[in-house]
Amino acid sequence: MDLKPAHVVVPAAHITRDEVGELFERKGISKEIGNHDPTYLTQWARYSLRQEFIEAEAGMTGCNFGVAATGDCVVCTNEGNADMSTSIPKLHIVSMGIDKVVPNYESLAVFQRLLIRSATGQPSVAFTSQFRKARPGGEMHVILVDNGRSDIIANPVHWRTAKCIRCGACMNTCPVYRRSMGYSYSYFIP
């Protein structure tokens, strides 16, 4: 299966459970041919991923928000994979756009609620993790990505685009996007 992501928050939203089941069968991940039950597939995905996390020398995560006052990196997930990436390997690498920085915890609380409710409609996510330093005996490196963001923020016409928190709400309400899952556009991220 060689598909591009279809959504900024739920990249595999366009893949059916049967397609996932067939992929797991081809890759040897699931053991029961034809069982495409989501709970069964989730269990095998966890088992398979756990083995990879245990053997990894480094884990890499994104960062939903960086808190300027404390230096914390905040990661919100529903699966908990970020915690596996940060707690098992000795090296944790965080990649974060400079537009993800919020001033303090009061601002974080506002943006976190906005992100979660706008992205999936949930009152909260299953996992919110905060990292300020490496785990004992480990290393943590934070990569701040500018990639033209400074120019956008400085531009009097385009600076508002830097306010996007990548929640996907605009995608969820767009009639074209709901039909095409982003494939009508050249890129799936707004």
Question: Regions from the language model: what does each represent?
Answer:
Residues 1-154:
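Iron-sulfur-associated redox domains of electron-transfer enzymes in respiratory
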Residues 114-117, 176-180:
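Short, well-ordered loop/turn and helix-capping segments at boundaries between secondary-structure elements
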Residues 135-161, 177-190:
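Ferredoxin-type iron-sulfur electron-transfer modules in oxidoreductases and energy-metabolism complexes
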Residues 164-170, 174:
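Short cysteine clusters
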